[in-house]
């Protein structure tokens, strides 16, 4: 289905006459991460989405905010004639679910290990060294090498666009 100009992959199964359970995966995951869980609820309608940039869904062409993901989800659910779903989100998917629930009616919301505010983390020694080295003339050329050995696995595995989106999401605080 085309949503916000992107091909979005999803599966929709189970009892379509019952409340829809909408499953949203975490960063770097896809439908398969939630499929086993969704299969336990076949008495309900089950919708599992490959979020844009993951699985078989198209990658955004611009940096998407959490609001963009919420708008995409809302448009998808409207096209599927789903009102007041139960949203189950893991990590990144839970963050999207949290913001969705502040804008639209949901029957229930289940968030699993979902960040809702910017994490204040003490920088590791490696990160401090990288930041310092970037300021030293002649060492900037080592930045690419250093990032390969310092960044998170999710960051390393992401495309350039998804890295920008990841930074946007990590810094997005929805606690207010």
Question: Where are the regions that the model predicts?
Answer:
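Active-site loop/oxyanion-hole signature of alpha/beta-hydrolase fold enzymes
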Residues: 47-88
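Conserved alpha/beta-hydrolase catalytic His-Asp/Glu region
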Residues: 120-127, 132-176
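Conserved catalytic-core motifs of eukaryotic protein kinase domains, centered on the activation segment
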Residues: 33-35, 57-63, 121-122
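Short gly/ser/thr-rich secondary-structure transition/capping motifs
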Residues: 2-7, 29, 165-172
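Flexible "cap/lid" loop of the alpha/beta hydrolase fold
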Residues: 95-138
